[in-house]
């Protein structure tokens, strides 16, 4: 009894002392927030704390913590450092490399994902420390492209719940369901309906894998606290016949809802999450084309929400397009002079088109005539060929980019002209692929691009996953020439051109932008997420590279610099939110104080609000 009383007094005393320290810090004006004070009061101990990945430290629990949390004797006696834990984990991966290095790459990547996922399930702090320190190697494992394979095999890989599932069977219950999530505060939600997963089609409930992977990158790149992120799957059924017939499928085995029924489910979900967490940011992920733009327009002026496939992909593409202008030795202001042939008119293609047109128009004066002049710089080709006003049942979103027949005939083209014909006649500066059709940029198309009027034509093969890329970098450099600028949506290795020359592969991953967009919106307290924020973010990314890097064909920076890139992008978003009078501030930084910050102070503010994977001091307090 004496020992128990003594422990109780010790714990209570420690809680009071730590609370006093935080109160003292709060009384002094500082950019620091709770992200900088790694204290966590927990309501569990003993085996319960070891089963909680948010707080479990494994062998790194100190002896005093083991006493406070009733862990003494439940762990091996040697208290390990973080570095030692990473060394043990890395050793497991190196064994995997030795045993699978000669096997198929998919098998090896999936095996790495399994090992990382097991770490994620038992110790989130260690998982994110490993991910951040090896971001170039592991980002393609936790997200694109390996996550596509994970989603395809999800029913067999599922072991432990992560995130939340809202289904059409839950209609009328979602407002209460959101309170089943244990976190009192959620800053970021990534939600998918599984209808269009990475160009793999309708994967139903398996699609939650992309939401999980995307949030892993938010934490690693933007420093969003992992305890305040929530992956969500909206299961409204599936039209995938294989899943409907599979007795082991984990989702609803009925046809996908459509029309007003679908919208009713989405409306109820959005109302529920914003009722519990009014300041949360919701990012839509891998929603089929027919709904992606509809949902974005439906919610964007009411909630803090965006669609990474439409706006994120377009922002990264704009940054790359501006970088391609720089690679020609020209200033970015010359962007409106670029001739761009676009292959693909889905949600991603339309998003890029609209963003590029707005960027050009802004450079041309931002009036009605500027938008009209900008439109004439694009030639859009889909699976039926060149799009003109003669096209029947034309999507309203694509209508502004449809050429008039009398105008296009003067160029020797007509409705439905094949991609190779368009490239031959237009001689574009940029060939932009957003078609999700692997190999679309055939040898014939690439040879036609050799006649481009540009001194340095650019190829953007942006479709994911890797097999859907419109062409490989080897094909681009070998057919078009060493001078071409090449960007892709999935990772490829640089190409050895011989004579000591390297053909740089620029992965136009939307990872360059979406973490900074989310972080900037969060820290600015912006009421909504505007198109201008994406434009500001894209321009900041385009200007991130040095002149020397750009002249060498490098238009996107190394992913190893992603946290620094994210800070820069977030700063651009915060400044834009302030300029548009949308910023309301965050925590103890109100809107008026935010307006007073210069560039250096904004970056400092961002840095001090980014979560870092360091073990907090854990203190037990009974509920």
Swiss-Prot record:
Record bears the keyword NAD: yes
Q: Where in the cell is it found?
A: Mitochondrion matrix
Q: Which residues form the active site?
A: 143 (proton donor), 214 (proton acceptor)
* The entry's keywords: Metal-binding, Mitochondrion, NAD, Oxidoreductase, Transit peptide
One family from Pfam that matches here is Malic_M
Give cofactor(s), names only. Answer: Mg(2+); Mn(2+)
Tell me the enzyme class: oxidoreductase
Family annotation (Gene3D superfamilies): Malic enzyme, N-terminal domain (3.40.50.10380), NAD(P)-binding Rossmann-like Domain (3.40.50.720)
Transit peptide, from-to: 1-31
Q: Which residues bind a divalent metal cation?
A: 285-286, 309
Tell me which residues bind NAD(+).
196, 289, 345
- Can you cite a GO biological process for this protein? malate metabolic process
Instruction: Name the SMART domains for this protein.
Output: malic (SM01274), Malic_M (SM00919)
The keyword Transit peptide is annotated on this UniProt entry: yes
**Subunit:** Heterodimer of two related subunits.
One GO cellular component term, please give it: mitochondrial matrix
State the InterPro entries in the record: Aminoacid_DH-like_N_sf, Malic_enzyme_CS, Malic_N_dom, Malic_N_dom_sf, Malic_NAD-bd, Malic_OxRdtase, NAD(P)-bd_dom_sf
Under which pathway is this protein filed? Photosynthesis; C4 acid pathway
* Enzyme Commission number, as recorded: 1.1.1.39
Name the source organism.
Answer: Amaranthus hypochondriacus
Which cysteine pairs are covalently linked by disulfides here?
none
Indicate which residues the UniProt annotation says bind fumarate.
88, 122
Q: Which reaction does it catalyse?
A: (S)-malate + NAD(+) = pyruvate + CO2 + NADH
Q: What is this protein called?
A: NAD-dependent malic enzyme, mitochondrial
Specify which residues bind (S)-malate according to the UniProt entry for this protein. 196, 464, 509
């Amino acid at each position: 009894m004496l020992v128990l009383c003594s422990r109780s007094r010790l714990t209570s005393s420690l809680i009071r002392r730590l609370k006093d320290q935080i109160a003292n810090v709060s009384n002094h004006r500082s950019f620091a927030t709770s992200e900088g004070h790694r204290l966590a009061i927990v309501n569990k101990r003993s085996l319960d704390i070891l089963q909680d990945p948010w707080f479990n430290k494994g062998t790194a629990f100190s002896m005093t913590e083991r006493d406070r949390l009733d862990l003494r004797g439940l762990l091996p006696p040697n208290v390990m450092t973080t570095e030692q834990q990473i060394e043990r984990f890395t050793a497991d991966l190196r064994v995997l490399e030795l045993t699978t290095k000669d096997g198929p790459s998919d098998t090896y990547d999936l095996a790495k994902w399994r090992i990382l996922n097991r770490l994620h399930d038992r110790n989130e702090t260690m998982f994110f420390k490993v991910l951040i320190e090896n971001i170039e190697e592991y980002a393609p494992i936790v997200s694109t492209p390996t996550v596509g394979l994970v989603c395809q095999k999800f029913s067999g890989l599922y072991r432990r719940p992560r995130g939340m599932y809202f289904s059409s069977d839950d209609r009328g219950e979602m407002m209460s369901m959101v309170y089943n999530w244990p976190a009192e505060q959620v800053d970021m939600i990534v939600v998918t309906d599984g209808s269009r997963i990475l160009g793999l089609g309708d994967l139903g409930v398996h699609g939650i894998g992309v939401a999980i992977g995307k949030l892993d990158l938010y934490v690693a790149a933007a420093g969003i606290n992992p305890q305040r992120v929530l992956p969500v799957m909206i299961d409204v059924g599936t039209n995938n016949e294989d899943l409907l017939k599979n007795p082991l499928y984990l989702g609803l085995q009925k046809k996908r809802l459509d029309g007003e029924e679908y919208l009713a489910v989405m409306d109820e979900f959005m109302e529920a999450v914003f009722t519990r967490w009014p300041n949360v940011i919701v990012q839509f992920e891998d929603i089929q084309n027919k709904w992606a733009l509809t949902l974005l327009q439906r919610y964007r002026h009411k909630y803090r929400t965006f669609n990474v496939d439409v706006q994120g992909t377009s922002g990264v593409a704009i940054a790359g397009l501006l970088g391609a202008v720089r690679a020609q030795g020209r200033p970015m202001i010359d962007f409106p002079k670029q001739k761009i042939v676009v292959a693909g008119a889905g949600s991603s293609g339309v998003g890029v088109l609209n963003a590029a047109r707005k960027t050009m128009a802004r450079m041309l004066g931002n009036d009605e005539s500027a938008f009209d002049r900008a439109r004439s710089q694009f030639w859009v080709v889909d699976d039926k060929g060149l799009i003109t006003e003669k096209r029947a049942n034309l999507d309203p979103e694509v209508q502004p980019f449809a050429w008039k027949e009398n105008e296009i005939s003067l160029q020797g083209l007509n409705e439905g002209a094949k991609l190779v014909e368009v490239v031959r006649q237009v001689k574009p500066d940029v060939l932009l692929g957003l078609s999700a059709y692997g190999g679309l940029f055939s040898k014939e198309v690439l040879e036609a691009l050799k006649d481009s009027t540009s001194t340095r034509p650019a190829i953007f093969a942006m479709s994911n996953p890797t097999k859907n890329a419109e062409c490989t970098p080897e094909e681009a450099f070998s057919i078009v020439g060493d001078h071409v600028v090449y960007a892709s949506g999935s990772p490829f290795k640089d190409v050895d051109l011989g004579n000591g020359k390297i053909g740089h592969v620029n992965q136009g991953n939307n990872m360059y932008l979406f973490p900074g967009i989310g972080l900037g919106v969060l820290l600015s307290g912006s009421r909504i997420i505007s198109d201008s924020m994406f434009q500001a973010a894209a321009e900041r990314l385009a200007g991130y590279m040095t002149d020397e890097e750009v002249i060498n064909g490098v238009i996107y920076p190394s992913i190893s610099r992603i946290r620094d890139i994210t800070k820069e992008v977030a700063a651009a978003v915060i400044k834009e939110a302030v300029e548009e009078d949308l910023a309301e501030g965050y925590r103890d930084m109100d809107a008026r104080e935010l307006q007073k910050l210069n560039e250096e102070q904004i970056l400092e503010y961002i840095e001090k609000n980014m979560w870092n994977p360091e073990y907090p001091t854990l203190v037990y307090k009974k509920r």
